[in-house]
Amino acid sequence: MTKIRKAKETMSAKERVLRTFAFEKTDRVPIDYATNGSIHHRLCVELGIPGDNYDLLLEALGVDYRGVAPAYTGPLLYPPLPGRQVDPLYGFYTRWVENESGGYHDFCDFPLQGADEETIRAFPFPSPDDFDYDAALEQIKRQKDYAVYVGNPGTGDIINSLDYARSNDNG
């Protein structure tokens, strides 16, 4: 088991991030964490973190940020496909692709590939009423010592999001 050695910290994660965005001096550079499942698992094993526990790993790494999101509670909008995962919000399909590092989920079965305007207009999207905002508020309260963000790197990424639904050739 590997142990991460960190320098003594003199400020909270939230203070560090706020100072960084204000272009003020901090005790260290703020840290975030995002990876695929295979690498996450290997990192947890190496650090002796049981059950691939995400929160324990964030603590071990000294991650300053915590993401929050309201849970989707609405109806199933997209049909399940054998051997695939489907994104419940946007209808993106992924399949497991093995590689020498373990593997990853890659986009496939593009639901709007070759679709005409009418099909695109009729494509279902979740209603804002189908989310548990109270649970998101509780997440925020639990993360009060961290810099909290909503969304993910793909939230504002219109071009890649179109590719996930229409394919690289049609995005």
List each language-model region with its residue ranges.
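Catalytic cores of TIM-barrel enzymes
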Residues: 2-171
